[in-house]
Amino acid sequence: MDPAWVGDTVYFISDRDGVANVWSYDTKAKKLAQVTRFTDFDVKTVDSGAGAVVFEQAGYVHELDPKSGREHVVTITAAGDFPWMMARWEDVTSRMTNISLSPTGKRVVVESRGEIFTIPAEKGDVRNLTNSAASAERDPAWSPDGKFISYFSDKSGEYKLVIEEQDGLKPPREIALANPTHYYTPAWSPDSKKILFTDTGLHLWVLDVATGQARTVGRDPWMVPRRTMNPVWSPDSKWIAYSSHLDSLYHAIFVVNAETGENKQVTDGLSDAMWQAWDAGGKYLWFLASTDFGLGSQWLYMTSYDHTQTFGLYCAVLKKGEPSPLLPESDEDQGVGSAPSGGSGGRGGRGGAPAGEGAAAEAGGAQADQPAPTPRGPRTPVTVTIDFAGLPQRIISIPGVANRQYSALEAGVAGTVYYLEAGGGGGGRGGAGGGSVLWRYRLSDRREAQFVTGVAEYALSADGHKLLYRGTGGGGGAGGGGGRGGAAIGPALFLVDADRNPPQAGQGRLTATLRMYLDPKEEFKQIFDEGWRNQRDYLYVPNMHGTDWVKDKQMYAQLLPSVMHRADLNYLIDMMGSEISIGHSYVRGGDMPEVPTSPGGGLLGADFAIDAGRYKIARIYDTESWNPDLRAPLAAPGVDVAVGDYILQIGGIDLKAPDNIYRLLDGTANRQTVLTVNSKPVVEGARQVTVVPVASEQALRTRAWVESNRRQVEKLSNGQLAYVYIPNTSQPGYQSFNRYYFAQQDKKGAVVDERYNGGGSAADYIVDVLQRDFDGYFNNVAGDRVPFTSPAAGIWGPKVMIINEMAGSGGDLMPYMFKFRKIGTLVGKRTWGGLVHTADTPTFVDGGSMIAPRGGFFSKDGRWAVENEGVAPDIDVENTPKEVIAGHDPQLERAVEEGMRLLKAKPANLMTKEPASPTWGKRGVPAKPTAPSAPSAPPRKPGDPR
């Protein structure tokens, strides 16, 4: 790679000896030689000039003398101020996440850029409990007794559990955890004596606060992209409910005894049950369940597309003999002075909210604020009794709650639950500009009500009376005109009464500003260490592909003091990750220094040639057919511009070669721009046209390439082969396949082009359709009575797939499946070779990330496959620059040739006529007997049962 000429010799980088070094090839002597022999850091780039070769290695620039073969490090002195590397006070308010509340909602605790802050509801100051850019503190949780805040901290180099007094005035207590890794979902028991949490390996832990000892009490045996255990404590601190995958990949609800560790499965696995929550009254276990989960269980696969899974609200009655909370109700007049009846039909008997705990009516949604409720005391202690025998038969579906895309179920005061519905702006039940809808359901009135929109996450106080939510910036309160399209609320925190009427739009907004003292050098080291740990803890195999990962860290850490820009930190972490030799180990993002940006360069959707010192239009790209999302500036109706015209001025400024046309188009994207054009390269007689340049031509040029290929296949095959392009294995690829494949099912075969496929999901749906055969016919009573195939949708002749080295991930797996199932012929070049999937690697404190692949592919014979290997074609064809420049596509042309050969060898041979009409209604004529026979039965009379 990276070739550079010096005379007749080409210098380039090759890792054929295991480390990327400089090699050379003498084109006259036809001699190959290794030039450098580094054994630690790879050579990264090579260039040449003035008879010398320069290259980068280990962060230094080296100069190589081709004659002597000697190289030396070039001394470069470049002084810079690097203002972005100065320690400073940083506003991190916009980075709040993992929000939580004090027991009664007097203060809020959040994580923001690796710091733990508490925020007053009304009075007081913001407190930063951690104050260290050199470490990451995550996932705060407030103890129900109000005394402590716990969080995880990597200050020691590994994550530990930290317990700190809520005012932050005393040194915190650090608790080392076995097999240190990344931790999730911390939750204090209601009695503040234990803390539960989960880890990278999907184990459920319970830690005794007094002793600091932790033990596992449950696990999820299947790793899928979302972490869905979501463990929760029972009100009496005796039980933990969590969800775990069964071998069917459906979730079931489990309950574990926190003392004994005994696990019991609550749901039977015939629904996908998760997001469990204990009712505060101790009588019920709420959860969400889906009976249409089905294809959603195969989360990686395209077959699950267009199959939306919805969830309903359910409630399990824990104790045998406890009445259903939904028994029929009837208003009965007891006479003046009579006390209200209780029993199973009243609120008391159903575990409903007592006075002052959510009994307020919600008719019509938004109402004026009610008077302040009576001050509340602590919850009455409850004892949770669970009769596991017969428990599945005591599960109740909650009526009046339509099945939707629910998640994040939480329990408030007794008889009240909250849950999010996925929404995405633009009407419906989603917020006006994104985020989810928060719903509340109360047994007291047996109905759900929309509580607030535009929610990113929410939390309830331990007493259930306060609700904190983080907005997305596009929703609003359910009251005061918020509704389903409420006023914008901004990405901020809102603290509202949980058991009162839905809040007005913007009500309860917390205006605190979170600031931390940020030393970028310290934060860079923490991010570097975290990237290393992420690979150690999340990589799909434990052996790090055989590399010495500890040694790798030590080697690359030497360069860390020289890193003076966030992009350079990404580069360093990426180089370290390359030692594992794995695809999808992407390093990206982070808090980059702000730089001035252009308002957007404009593009005209055209190719140009220089003629007579002017820019001449050589080609105009249009939107082709049926592409409403495309806009072609020069092909719009009414724009009087044609191929061969000259663009003489842009915005009144003269345009002549060698001036760059794009200089005059800078800042014109999506803005009206006046062009002066003429059929001749002179201003005299020119005309002015107003166009609106686009910001990108990629979609226009891609569509033109696709349609050109389709027409070429149509021409070369005499209309017998379809052409289908699949850009990726995500939604765009799914849509492109469905659009082009079925629209051409009148063809006899197909050329499927997946070159440059960007991957996404596993394209089982596409491969299944390509493999599909038909089983017979149904006749057609119209036209020439050409019959329908059964199934009707498909192309039944040969298929050829074109692949190249720029197709990877899902673009690797699709041709692998195509080849493995012997559907057809692969033509082109070996694919990229990156077949692992990614999932849940945590982000860095500044929003960047380093992905650790979470799953690798191996074949049915037990061999790791495709990763670092790719899928080889059956017919190897290179698209050489010479042939492409000449207007040819050798891979496409060879694919058509192969398709036509297969079509001749194995034609589909579809029937074009139906058989002779059947005569099933014709009465048969009995044959004349040739020998005496028994007397025949008398004719059957009407009504005779024989």
Predicted regions and their residues:
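Multi-bladed beta-propeller domains
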Residues: 1-6, 15-17, 24-44, 66-94, ...
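Residue-level detector of Asp-centered blade-edge/turn motifs that repeat once per structural unit
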Residues: 5-7, 48-50, 103-104, 144-145, ...
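Hydrophobic beta-strand positions that form the internal "hydrophobic ladder"
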Residues: 10, 53, 108, 149, ...
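Structural motif
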Residues: 18-23, 62-64, 117, 158-162, ...
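Short, conserved, GDST-rich strand-edge loop motifs in beta-rich repeat architectures
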Residues: 245, 289-308, 321-346, 354, ...
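Extended, small/polar residue-biased N-terminal targeting/export presequences
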Residues: 561-616, 683-691, 696-709, 896-932
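PDZ/PDZ-like domain segments forming the peptide/carboxylate-binding groove
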Residues: 599-657, 730-731, 855-856
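Cleft-lining beta-strand/loop regions that shape enzyme active-site pockets
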Residues: 624-634, 648, 653-845, 883-890, ...
